[in-house]
UniProtKB/Swiss-Prot annotation:
Its EC number is 2.1.3.2. It comes from Nitrosospira multiformis (strain ATCC 25196 / NCIMB 11849 / C 71). L-aspartate binds at K94, R179, R234. GO terms for biological process: 'de novo' pyrimidine nucleobase biosynthetic process; 'de novo' UMP biosynthetic process; amino acid metabolic process. This is Aspartate carbamoyltransferase catalytic subunit. Gene3D superfamilies: Aspartate/ornithine carbamoyltransferase. The keyword Transferase applies. Heterododecamer (2C3:3R2) of six catalytic PyrB chains organized as two trimers (C3), and six regulatory PyrI chains organized as three dimers (R2). It is an enzyme of class 2 (transferase). Pfam families: OTCace, OTCace_N.
Length: 316
């Protein structure tokens, strides 16, 4: 029996809560399963019947555009029934607890919950209390994790670079407040990337981040040298409890990705960004819209990856 709360007694994926602690075999299975779904998204009839009759509830307690929309599209392309809970109009606004909300929705014969919440651990809490036939996907919880974003990033990297084992990857920006960065680091190291770098000012790095197996840089010129993949992160101003930077202009001067800084990486380096982008803060428009950017393909691949996660969970 597995001690991982994401796995069932047979070692199959029961919930997707974080990339941390998941074996490479499960991560690779998700990436492999996503491959044929890319073709589905390119067809005239963008639908397969794998989740016909299943009810998927999207519970987004934080604002979202890409994640919520791509989860909804992914579920509908799998032929599931999708219910988007309007949090502002729900009983949550009247003081109902998170678990009471989930228990009531479970009584409506939900099959899967996709959850985004400002509190770290919210998806784990739900997973601990739902029936064994219900699956939970963490769509982002506080500063903790965003596993499907990391997985679609891994899918994008593999599509462009084929092999994880010879890559030098740099994650640049607000590492301290980023759930994406944590999920990316766990996925990259699990999949065998030999060198993962984080580049940020000291005020935007977690304490003892080196324990995650990353190399820390405070200087873009050194950190970007010979890098294959650049993963840019926005400043999470909504999670900052105090001022950590003199100004966004100063941040862009030292840490914004410009064509000049990108030239320090390998000539065929690719640039990723989970969105939303703040042009002129963490990335220059010339780079964001340039030939080395794979930011829009990330969004497209996100649908296929989320289809893969849902279909695997439904099959477990």
């Amino acid at each position: 029996m597995s001690n991982n709360p994401q796995l069932n007694k047979s070692g199959q994926l029961q919930h997707l809560l974080t990339t941390e602690g998941l074996p490479a075999s499960i991560l690779l299975n998700i990436l492999d399963t996503a491959e044929p779904f890319v073709g589905v998204t390119e067809r005239d009839v963008k639908k397969v019947p794998l989740l016909r009759g299943k009810s998927i509830f999207n519970l987004f307690f934080e604002p979202s555009t890409r994640t919520r929309t791509t989860f909804e599209i992914a579920a509908k392309r799998l032929s599931a029934d999708v219910i988007n809970l309007n949090i502002a109009a729900s009983s949550q606004s009247k003081g109902e607890t998170l678990l009471d909300t989930v228990n009531n929705l479970s009584a409506m014969h939900a099959d899967m919950f996709v959850v985004r919440h400002a509190q770290s651990g919210a998806a784990h809490l739900i997973a601990q209390h739902v029936r064994s036939d219900i699956h939970v996907i963490n769509a982002g919880d506080g500063r903790h994790a965003h596993p499907t974003q990391a997985l679609l990033d891994m899918f994008t990297i593999r599509r462009c670079k084929r092999d994880f084992h010879n890559l030098r990857v740099a994650i640049v920006g607000d590492i301290l407040h980023s759930r994406v960065a944590r999920s990316q680091i766990h996925a990259l190291t699990t999949l065998g990337v030999p060198e993962v770098r984080v580049i940020a000012p000291k005020t935007l790095l977690p304490a003892k981040v080196e324990r995650l197996g990353v190399h820390v840089y405070h200087d873009m010129a050194k950190g970007l040298k010979d890098v294959d993949v650049l993963m840019m992160l926005r400043l999470q101003n909504e999670r900052m409890l105090s001022a950590r930077l003199p100004s966004t202009e100063e941040y862009f001067k030292y840490y914004g990705l410009t064509p000049e800084k990108l030239a320090l990486a390998k000539p065929d380096a690719i640039v990723l960004h989970p969105g939303p982008m703040n042009r002129g803060v963490e990335i220059d428009s010339v780079v964001a819209d340039g030939k080395q950017s794979v930011i829009l393909p990330q969004v497209t691949f996100g649908i296929a990856v989320r289809m893969a996660v849902m279909s695997i969970l439904a099959g477990s």
